[in-house]
Structures are given as structure tokens and as C-alpha cells.
Amino acid sequence: EKELSLWREAGADRYLLRFETSNPELYKSIHPSLTGQEPDRLELLRTIKRIGYETGSGIMVGIPGQTFDDLAKDIETFRDLDLDMIGVGPFIPHQETLLGRKAKTPGILPEEQVPNTELMTYKVMALARLVQPLANIPATSALATLNTPTGRELGLSRGANVVMPNLTPKKYRALYEIYPSKACIDETAADCRSCMHRRIRSIGRQVGEGRGDSPSYKKA
């Protein structure tokens, strides 16, 4: 807490920490901790909020072992934490990771497993908007990876209100391939900016100006 407070005093005013899942056992299975070092992300998010940061968090949809009950609890957690920003993205497996190679979901029935689909992600985004109507909710690059032609546009029509342009220099983008076939990996930052503007205008929306503070944070 002291370190977070010092950063806040030094000028930091936003903090993003995904809790990934509200199910502690599922969280441990995807983020194994060293013995005696098991951070409580939910409690840390409460501390971040109390210190005065614009607070963002979020989840993956369709993690192996994630049930619909887990997902319902996640959505309730968005509300309980009173998040200013909510990131919701599909789990896209990467075969170079242990989680990406996990073929089975032990402990749950197949029909209980949340699908990591585009449609399910839209449903969660829409529900997140209902429980936190003033939060910033991004249409993510993961959605654009699942549906390159219209993923971001559909996200903006199903609860999202912001996008996150990729400013990473083109020559470094391939070094951050967190999932296969990531969208826009060959674009320059300028290409990305003009593309985002075009996509937003295509659905009758306007590009905002200013810092982009969450309406939820402004309310507080």
C-alpha cells in the first residue's frame, strides 16, 4: 500500500490489474504462486480504489475450468468493486503455454465449461455494461483477432465504449504475440490510428477528445 501511495503522489492516477477470475481455485490453477506468496488481487484492487486511482480490472472468458457460475460471480465482482474500467476478452489458447495446451477441464462437466467464443464475450461485455453503466469497457484486440473484419465494431455495439490503439513500433510487435495470429501485427501506429477512426465512424460514433477518463471515475 505504501508503494502504491507513493506512485499516486508522484502523479500516477490509473491502475489496471485484472483479477482474471473470481474463483480462487481456478485462479491458482492458471497463476501458480510461490509458497507463502499468494497475492489477493481482489483485496489489492480495493486498496487501489481507496487510494484514489482510476481503477481497471477484468477477466478472460472461456478459461479451461471456468463455469457459468464463475462467470456470474465475475460480473457481480465488477459491480462490487465499482470498477472504472472493465476489460473482457476471450481466452485464446497459445500452444507455447501450459494453459494453451490443456486439453481437458478436470472437475467440471463439459456443459459447465464456458466457451471462449466471440458471442460469449459480447454477452459478458453487455452484462458488464448493465452492472457498471458508467465504466469504460474496451473493444479489445482479442475480439479483433477472432473477428478481424468487424470484431471491434460489434464490441462497440454490445457494451464497449473505448478502443486501445496499438502504439508499439511495428518491428517489436511480433515479439509480443500473447496469442496466435494477433490482429494488426503488421500495422504501424499511424495505420492503427487511421483504421480506428474509420471503424468508429463506420458505425455512426464519434471519436472522443481529452484524457478519456472513465465517467465512473469522474462521478466519484
Q: Where are the language model's segments positioned?
A:
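A cross-domain feature marking catalytic cores of carbohydrate-active enzymes
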Residues: 19-21, 55-61, 88-90, 139-141
